[in-house]
Amino acid sequence: MITHDELTDMMAARLSKGEDLDLIYTNPKNHIVCFIPTYEPGGDSTKCYFVDGREELVCLPMRIITRELAVQEGLRPNYIMTSDGRRSSYTSPKIYGPHLTFAHIKCRRPVGKDVVYGLFNVAIPYEYIVTEGPEPDTSYIHVGNFAPILVYQSPRHVKHKLNEAMLEHCNYVRKMLARIKLSQNPQVVAELFIAWRDLTR
């Protein structure tokens, strides 16, 4: 019979390897890879990329989409905290839940006060590959089977932002698992994971 500590350690090990995504990171079909601000249809819109390979254009500014996402995840949009409980600055990694930790990377030239930063989720089963862009201080981000995404920051800076977000994500998940461990009841652990998965579909 598996003990509570073994169960939690097993979940942590699988989490670190990216396994059992349906159990740990909600339904992969609806799992977000990134949000990219764009003017493609002539207005301020957002491209949404999903783990299952879908790419959808939403005719809403990214500011509205992230606000709605925060509310859906039960968060206060203007008070998203870091993994150590501090209020997150504008371009710091943003944690919306165990399945959503975003790195801010500049994706377009600024026009007025429109959002210029895309949000790249590091809690996904893909690795981001960063290559040189067509101009100095630009890069291409390659992920999954999507076309390369042009960003307006150097490869070194982009890698730093992605690593920073991954570190924040790991700290958050480690703390979440530590809190679950306090329950001393494997049944509670299982129910928490199942309930969380159902609520985040």
Where are these regions (language model features)?
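Eukaryotic intrinsically disordered, low-complexity regulatory linkers and tails enriched in Ser/Thr/Pro
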Residues: 1-201
